[in-house]
Amino acid sequence: MFFTQPPHLVKAEELKQEPPKGTAYSVAIPGTEQPGRSRVYRAWNAQKELLTTLDPQVTTAHDMFESTANRQPKNHCLGWRPYNSTTKTWDPYQWLTYETVQKRRAAFGAGLVELHQKHNCHRPGQYGVGLWAQNRPEWQITDLACISQSLYSVSIYDVLAPDATEYIINHAELNCVVTSLPHIPTLLKLKSSLPNLKMIVSLDPLDGPEQNGHSKRALLESMAAGLDLAIYTIDQVEELGLASKRGYNAPSASDIVTINYTSGTTGPPKGVVLTHGNAVAATSCGLTTIGQARGDTMCSYLPLAHIYARLAEHTAFWGGARIGYFHGNIVELVDDLKLLKPTGFMSVPRLYSRFGTAIRAATVEQPGFKGALSRHIVAAKMANMKNPDPSKATIKHALYDRIWAKKVAAALGLERAKYMISGSAPLDPTLHNFLRVATGTDVVQGYGLTESYASATAQSTQDLSSGNCGRLAPCTEACLVSLPDMEYSVEDKPFPRGELLLRGNNMFREYYKNDDETSKAVTEDGWFRTGDVCTVDAQGRFIIIDRRKNVLKLAQGEYISPERLEGVILSELGYVAQAYVHGDSSETFLVGIFGVAPDLFAPYASKVLGKTIAPTDVEGLKEHLNDDKLRRAVLRDLERVAKKHKFAGYERVRNVSLKVDPFTVENNLLTPTLKLKRPPVVKMYRTLLDQLYGQANEEQSAPRAKL
């Protein structure tokens, strides 16, 4: 069956094209430089005007979904795997059509307004609805429902600690939280500290075959008695909306689409106010980077409370793709991927590193013919990719892709994937290139922040370089500002270096109820200070080289970027699942606390110690992590990595402690997006860090035997 691509997708393909020969991806606009500030950069095809939308008729997230639902109502939209209580397994995917989702979101949106009126919480203008659940179809139905009535969602990370949940609900003044069943008891316990909360809407059924008084609803309502708090299910609210006959109250481009609370690595979360105009601009750029179309499939597993995942689903909706949700267990994600066979995949370096480790173990590290053939294929494809003639460079190979790379991709469920995208942290160049040749798939790296609606830069699928974040999105402009205290200058040669500043149609409005933080983050002329230190190469590609906010200064005055070192270590040592590199200002070297991956570290430890430790024997592994033989073996690996990446002497980790899961969301050392909270890590592990320094200093001062 043939169909015509809608005009906005045709325009996206046009904007996706490579620049003319001799033109950089991002162009410095003459005459825009200022003292201490570089020229302003824009995408080569947006030099005159930044992109606002791919379709003048589409200016809101409401429009994006409606245009697709009206164009292809019978197509698959949202999919999930039901749990089979008989077999204790997850069934194949079931799907809701765009038409069904459209009707349900309209009913639920109307019902939410009716509910607020019923409890005397409805007020003129916009207000927020809390959304606290793991990725699932009802998450998007709720978000789309809010949008349909000019309400905005306030997402709460599924794994957020109770104190942070309490802070967000109170700060955003939420009267209603839509949530999954496991979170309802937590909300009931917190109710005494949540004066504004009047309604909870459960995404899960509360009525079952239990006897009277023993249903989930009865138990929860008994807990809620006297708390001035009503509990409903999504079905009840949808029925309320249908009965109301209430139509859409569509938003405008300047209306809020969401308040997205940042992870809060150093303090309380900040509420990033994002508008419908921001959403449309960022989604337009997403479609110019990767494209989405009818017949495409994406897998949703990255937390939807993170704007990176939300942008991905906006892009799927406006492109006409379908979204299949993982069944909730990240360890079994590949099972979902093998069923879905997505046409594209978005992830983070941490997962790509595990993919790379698994692929190497199954191919190039195998003994005998299988390993030899794999190494030959990787070497041949790597040579093709690095062909000095860009017109001949390719990750494809007519024979090797068919007999080898296709099988590698299929083992991950990614044999249909046209692209893989990495974001949220730098992707190691060696891993980047290996994934390209091993899977035969375009792997691109992007850069964005919550404040930029996850959109700022992205590599072209035709650009086979690595170690950079690619070109500017056509909705965004950028410049660099000198940092004299860190010895970065926009006058540096061969390329300018400085803090990256962003401005554009995708950029946030403000931090909610926080003028002080807003004024710190945004200059008077509208530039957002990212805190990331960048350079821009001759092709107009942006490269993150440092982080202004997380720089250590050692005793002899050397500046260290621990996040850069941690990223390299995580990508090189597959058995390291978590890495924290620490430097005291009174010391001349670094120490580290590493969390090991039991399934990968157990074989390594068995080899070093000469005894068998089963990958599933986590407690047994923990007993051996303090063995000095293991510590010294890991330090040798760290030294090898340091030499390979040409770390300076003061950048080398001289002592290390090995643990299983030392940093978790539950112990408040990780944000919900799994970023380290560095000050709390130091506070919790201060004694251990002192011991690591003491041990290393003793070992360095101990006399060495002469040979």
Curated annotation (Swiss-Prot):
Domain of life: Eukaryota
Region (Fatty acid-binding): 525-549
Localization: Peroxisome matrix
EC number(s) stated in the UniProt entry for this protein: 6.2.1.-
Annotated binding of ATP, by residue: I259, N260, Y261, T262, S263, G264, T265, T266, G267, P268, P269, K270
GO biological process: mycophenolic acid biosynthetic process; terpenoid biosynthetic process
Keywords: ATP-binding, Ligase, Magnesium, Nucleotide-binding, Peroxisome
Pathway assigned in UniProt: Secondary metabolite biosynthesis; terpenoid biosynthesis
Motif Peroxisome targeting signal, residue range(s) on this chain: 705-707
Molecular function terms from GO: ATP binding; CoA-ligase activity; ligase activity; long-chain fatty acid-CoA ligase activity; polyketide synthase activity
Annotated catalysed reactions: (4E,8E)-10-(4-hydroxy-6-methoxy-7-methyl-3-oxo-1,3-dihydro-2-benzofuran-5-yl)-4,8-dimethyldeca-4,8-dienoate + ATP + CoA = (4E,8E)-10-(4-hydroxy-6-methoxy-7-methyl-3-oxo-1,3-dihydro-2-benzofuran-5-yl)-4,8-dimethyldeca-4,8-dienoyl-CoA + AMP + diphosphate
Location, primary (coarse class): other
Family (UniProt): Belongs to the ATP-dependent AMP-binding enzyme family.
UniProt function note: Acyl-CoA ligase involved in the biosynthesis of mycophenolic acid (MPA), the first isolated antibiotic natural product in the world obtained from a culture of Penicillium brevicompactum in 1893. The peroxisomal acyl-CoA ligase 891 converts the intermediate MFDHMP-3C into MFDHMP-3C-CoA which impairs its diffusion from the peroxisome. The first step of the pathway is the synthesis of 5-methylorsellinic acid (5MOA) by the cytosolic polyketide synthase mpaC.
Protein name according to UniProt: Acyl-CoA ligase 891, peroxisomal
Organism of provenance: Penicillium brevicompactum
